[in-house]
A protein has these predicted regions:
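Short, flexible active-site-adjacent loop segments at beta-strand->alpha-helix junctions, enriched
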Residues: 22, 46-50, 56-58, 83, ...
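Short, glycine/charged-enriched secondary-structure capping and boundary segments
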Residues: 30-34, 56-59, 112, 128-131, ...
Length: 220
């Protein structure tokens, strides 16, 4: 529906970057989906691909539950940490940021736009390591986020951060404000003012706004 707002035909999409294999991120390319993107080539981290081959099972809720294996039949290109390549003149750099999943990949586009998937949760007071109950390894997630910040700082890169669930920000300091803290699903804001909560107001995500090319950021 939302691609239709922009006049984009899903069947015309030829390349899709996969941050990680959770169904809420890859459902539209799963074998039992409607097949909207059946012609697209998928780019996924080599480590993350082990979930897709069945070598590793995805565990959530502090490893209490195993999720069903995700099946994808599209052509895949396996990527590695630090790899850079181009698609139709667009430069893409890969950053391995494990923790939420073992092979979670973050993509920097033309040095300006960082697609962070489920590595950062933008709370109203800044970014946190993503929801603790859904991580394979929370300590690794926190450490990986700090390493990502250091890599970007070392290259003086301050991109726009586009998250998988909590909107976007172009405020570097805000994005990493609480990188050493987990977004806990057990902290309730009504009882705990320090509990992180989603700062992204989805009421802003309308057809009119999308066509104007602007959705409000957070931390600005």
């Amino acid at each position: 529906e939302k691609m239709g707002w922009l006049g984009i035909d899903p069947s015309s999409i030829r390349h899709i970057l996969i941050t990680h294999q959770d169904t809420d991120h890859v459902g539209a390319v799963e074998a039992d989906s409607l097949g909207l993107f059946r012609k697209a080539k998928l780019y996924v981290g080599e480590t993350e691909n082990r979930y897709l081959t069945g070598e590793v099972r995805r565990k959530v809720i502090y490893h209490l539950y195993k999720l069903p294996q995700v099946t994808i039949r599209n052509e895949k290109v396996l990527l590695h940490d630090g790899e850079a390549f181009e698609i139709d003149g667009i430069r893409i750099e890969c950053f391995l940021v494990p923790g939420h999943t073992w092979g979670h990949m973050v993509y920097l586009i033309d040095g300006k736009y960082l697609f962070t998937g489920d590595t950062i949760w933008l709370g109203a007071d800044g970014g946190y390591s993503f929801i603790s109950a859904l991580a394979e390894d929370n300590r690794l997630a926190v450490r990986s986020l700090a390493e990502l910040e250091a890599k970007l700082e070392a290259r003086k890169l301050h991109p726009m951060f586009l998250t998988g669930h909590t909107g976007w920000t172009d405020n570097f300091t805000f994005a990493f404000a609480h990188k050493d803290k987990l977004c806990s699903p057990f902290k309730k804001r009504v009882h705990d003012p320090s509990a992180p909560y989603d700062a992204y107001d989805e009421s802003d995500d309308t057809e009119e706004r999308s066509k104007s090319g602007y959705l409000k950021g957070v931390g600005r």
